[in-house]
Curated annotation (Swiss-Prot):
Protein name (Swiss-Prot/TrEMBL): Triosephosphate isomerase
Keywords on record: Cytoplasm, Gluconeogenesis, Glycolysis, Isomerase
Gene: tpiA
Any one Gene Ontology molecular-function term assigned to this protein's record: triose-phosphate isomerase activity
UniProt key word Cytoplasm: yes
Organism domain of life: Bacteria
């Protein structure tokens, strides 16, 4: 039985005051929930998050990472640095990183490897644009993104990783993939991994990300191959985020 995971991606939002209030509400609300819950704040707030959440049921992580371990890479953050702030998870390959900052499949797979090398859990984000979906390329695009990582690190590495399917056309748009649409892609991701190792595939948690709200979370999370959610905007509102977490149970 795969344990559900709900992870909040704060993106470039927050302040010390806002974060403290949000975290205290979430911390109080998830203490009795059987699913795993995590938050991914901007880098500068990791120390604050660690201070507030240490000893709680909540995990935390980062939104990106450098593929390098150290060196003259101005503005970059190494996975080993994230480990020192108590991070458990690191997002790699989020669609905004791919689209806005030119992260290729090669770069994403290198980041995935760097995260695992540091002892952290990568959350590999995959997904198609609207144009790719409308041209029937969803399965091809997602398979390519997944294969780039599998080709670099091997299928065994997926036993200590998470995958998040995020249809780009549904992120921040208010448009959500239907439960059936999401399930179809999640099942295809699991089948792709199963071609290499059935046991790893059966244990792999695959999250859905793309305009998840309290109103649609339960139906999405009720699908056979959807193991939780990667939550954007709703993760910034305690009541909404907690409602989504409850829907995962």
């Amino acid at each position: 039985m795969r344990k559900k995971l709900v992870a909040g991606n704060w993106k470039m939002h927050g302040s010390l005051q806002q974060n403290a209030a949000l975290l205290e509400l979430i911390k109080a609300g998830v203490s009795s929930l059987p699913c795993e819950v995590a938050v991914c704040p901007p880098y500068p707030y990791l120390g604050q998050v660690q201070s507030i959440l240490s000893g709680s049921a909540l995990a935390w992580g980062a939104q990106s990472v450098s593929e390098h371990q150290s060196g003259a890479f101005t503005g970059e953050v190494a996975a080993s640095m994230l480990l020192e702030f108590g991070c458990r998870y690191v997002l790699v390959g989020h669609s905004e990183r791919r689209a806005l900052y030119g992260e290729t499949d090669t770069v994403v797979s290198a980041k995935f490897e760097a995260v695992q090398r540091a002892g952290l859990v990568p959350v590999l984000c995959v997904g198609e644009t609207l144009a790719e979906r409308e041209s029937g390329m969803t399965s091809v695009v997602v398979a390519r993104q997944l294969s780039a990582v599998l080709g670099r690190v091997g299928v065994a590495a997926m036993a200590s990783a998470v995958v998040a399917y995020e249809p780009v056309w549904a992120i921040g748009t208010g448009v959500t993939a239907s439960p059936a649409q999401a399930q179809e892609v999640h099942a295809a991701i699991r089948a792709k991994v199963a071609e290499l190792d059935l046991g790893v595939a059966n244990g792999l948690r695959i999250l859905y990300g793309g305009s998840v709200k309290p109103q649609n979370a339960m139906e999405l999370f009720g699908q056979d191959d959807i193991d939780g959610g990667l939550i954007g905007g709703a993760a910034l509102v305690a009541d909404d985020f907690l409602a989504i977490c409850r829907a995962a149970n």
